[in-house]
């Protein structure tokens, strides 16, 4: 099966997120089209220029080098997922950005106090969004909301983890444990997060930055530290969609639910540029980070989400 979603509005277009989720598929390139085959049978084809993310969730997939190179040249992210939709690897384009070298130098020279202030603001916004989700789901939210006001520079008291423990037990019950290797709810969360993370990594590369140089995440084995930093505040959007499914007795990673999670990228948020879909707000956020590093004056264009998700989720 191939899942392919495309959306266009008056200002911007996020091209298709193409998922290959069945075994024994061969992905090749022909005359500007990405072609999906099983043996010699063509199952489908998508214009190369229409793809923004190639998501490989099946394990028995063969992809030609020509496809990977061409996708990278088109600023497309390729995501390789393991069991339960945990992303294990992303293939990232090296953007031909006019200020690529300068931006990376600014990343390297970014001061610790500056990064700690950025992380503080990220954590505050994430916790506020978590409190909003609890409120919308008619759960106790005021204590989580209060925690957001207690976050210090660099979150030295680890208020993020404290809020998370309260958040998950309130949202899905005391017996729920967030486990990336888990099934059911956890697998749905993994899938949604993988899509968000890939979109954020694409915005980072488009801005002439390298995702390995994070603000707070610094695991030596993680090549996407900066993407993991900046997509934290978007996680609660996925959480709410998964909660809506779960509350109706549905926690299967079905084609319908995958499409609902992918469509989260088109949920409207408020930015300094006006109302924007999530994926576009990521570009605004990362560009504001680039400008803040350059000017050494922190002014990030954080997306403000009002909790609205489309009715067809």
Question: Which role does the model predict for each range below?
Answer:
Residues 53-55, 62-98:
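N-terminal transmembrane hairpin
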């Amino acid at each position: 099966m191939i899942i392919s979603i495309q959306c266009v509005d008056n200002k911007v277009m996020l091209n298709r997120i193409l998922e290959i989720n069945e075994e024994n598929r061969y992905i090749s390139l022909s005359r500007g089209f990405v072609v999906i085959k099983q043996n010699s049978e063509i199952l489908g084809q998508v214009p190369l220029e229409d793809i923004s993310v190639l998501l490989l969730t099946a394990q028995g997939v063969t992809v030609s080098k020509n496809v990977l190179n061409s996708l990278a040249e088109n600023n497309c992210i390729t995501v390789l997922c393991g069991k339960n939709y945990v992303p294990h690897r992303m293939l990232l384009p090296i953007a031909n950005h006019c200020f690529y070298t300068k931006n990376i130098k600014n990343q390297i020279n970014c001061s610790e106090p500056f990064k700690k202030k950025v992380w503080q603001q990220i954590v505050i916004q994430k916790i506020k969004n978590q409190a909003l989700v609890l409120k919308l789901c008619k759960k106790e939210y005021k204590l989580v909301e209060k925690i957001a006001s207690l976050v210090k520079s660099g979150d030295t008291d680890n208020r993020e983890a404290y809020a998370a423990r309260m958040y998950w037990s309130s949202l899905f019950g005391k017996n729920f444990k967030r486990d990336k290797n888990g099934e059911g709810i956890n697998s749905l969360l993994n899938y949604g997060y993988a899509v968000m993370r890939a979109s954020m990594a694409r915005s980072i590369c488009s801005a002439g930055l390298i995702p390995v140089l994070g603000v707070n995440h610094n695991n030596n084995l993680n090549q996407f530290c900066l993407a993991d930093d900046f997509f934290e505040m978007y996680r609660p959007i996925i959480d709410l969609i998964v909660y809506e499914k779960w509350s109706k007795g549905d926690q299967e990673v079905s084609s319908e639910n995958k499409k609902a999670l992918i469509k989260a990228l088109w949920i409207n948020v408020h930015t300094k540029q006006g109302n924007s879909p999530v994926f576009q707000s990521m570009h605004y956020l990362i560009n504001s980070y680039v400008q803040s590093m350059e000017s050494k004056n922190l002014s990030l264009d954080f997306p403000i989400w009002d909790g609205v998700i489309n009715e067809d989720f």
